[in-house]
């Protein structure tokens, strides 16, 4: 993306690492952060191959990060393992019902997420705290305006990693 969410988190006082495969997007994120008087670190990386160190983040935030089905589960599990005990994974993504709207998102249903898919990806690894499917108003700039149908999922790594052996694999 272009850094809106990372900059917002930095404005709340969080240390932020924005990861994207686009150098252009990361440059825009850095420029937005500078314009708003906050700092964030950036990393150009492909989520298909990037492996963050285990237990290295307090939170992972995935906003409209749509991945092919073959990659989605592996990336979600890799990012879950990057959470420290008690860490949070927050995800918002378009649901297949988004195809009936013109407010953005992939046009390939296989790239859209359901709660069942997220539970299959992350169940047994993170504890589900919130799972929601809803229609929300979008106002994210050109091409992302109007109603959007999304899934929202919040999970927490167990306080003790041993409580979920999958975190150690």
Predicted regions and their residues:
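Conserved SAM-binding motif I beta-strand of class I
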Residues: 15-20
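Conserved SAM/SAH-binding beta-strand->alpha-helix loop
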Residues: 22-24
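Conserved SAM-binding strand-loop segment of SAM-dependent methyltransferases
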Residues: 35-48
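A short SAM/SAH-binding and catalytic strip from SAM-dependent methyltransferases
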Residues: 58-73
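A short glycine-rich, Lys/Arg-flanked "PGG" loop and its adjoining helix->strand segment in the class I
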Residues: 73-85
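Conserved beta-strand signature within the Rossmann-like core of class I S-adenosyl-L-methionine
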Residues: 86-94
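Short alpha-helix
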Residues: 109-132, 151-152
